[in-house]
């Protein structure tokens, strides 16, 4: 059994990560889950949320959008729509997006076509604010 995981994260625009890590924690569609070296093979979906990985005593955080995770042997492949590291999140922009989504949701009902899109925008903004607020490595 390997002592490290090979983590690769890819978006449609670019490869975001290619790192040797000790563990990951991901926002699965059925709840948060973790992966350590030697994990059982797995293919699952991700929801909007905070993704983290640990290298030694340092923990790194990203805001991710919907996607997939494949765990095979000691490799973790993450395919997501978007992924932003703490350093690349514009906190003021994320807070503005949160305000816009909250305001728009107050005007809508669940029957409106736009309602679920605004809920998703609200969730993305909240995750981006949470990740940006981590203030460096955990």
Curated annotation (Swiss-Prot):
NCBIfam families, per the entry = ATP_synt_epsi, PRK13446.1
Annotated Pfam families: ATP-synt_DE, ATP-synt_DE_N
GO cellular-component term (any): proton-transporting ATP synthase complex
Q: What does this protein do?
A: Produces ATP from ADP in the presence of a proton gradient across the membrane.
Query: Taxonomically, which superkingdom?
Result: Bacteria
Keyword list (alphabetical) reads:
ATP synthesis, Cell inner membrane, Cell membrane, CF(1), Hydrogen ion transport, Ion transport, Membrane, Transport
Q: What is its main location?
A: membrane
Indicate yes or no for the key word Cell inner membrane: yes
- Organism encoding this protein: Syntrophotalea carbinolica (strain DSM 2380 / NBRC 103641 / GraBd1)
Q: What is this protein called?
A: ATP synthase epsilon chain 2
The cellular location(s) given in this protein's UniProt record come to: Cell inner membrane
Family listed: Belongs to the ATPase epsilon chain family.
What InterPro entries is this protein classified in? ATP_synth_F1_dsu/esu, ATP_synth_F1_dsu/esu_N, ATP_synth_F1_esu_C, ATPsynth_dsu/esu_N
Q: Does the keyword Cell membrane apply?
A: yes
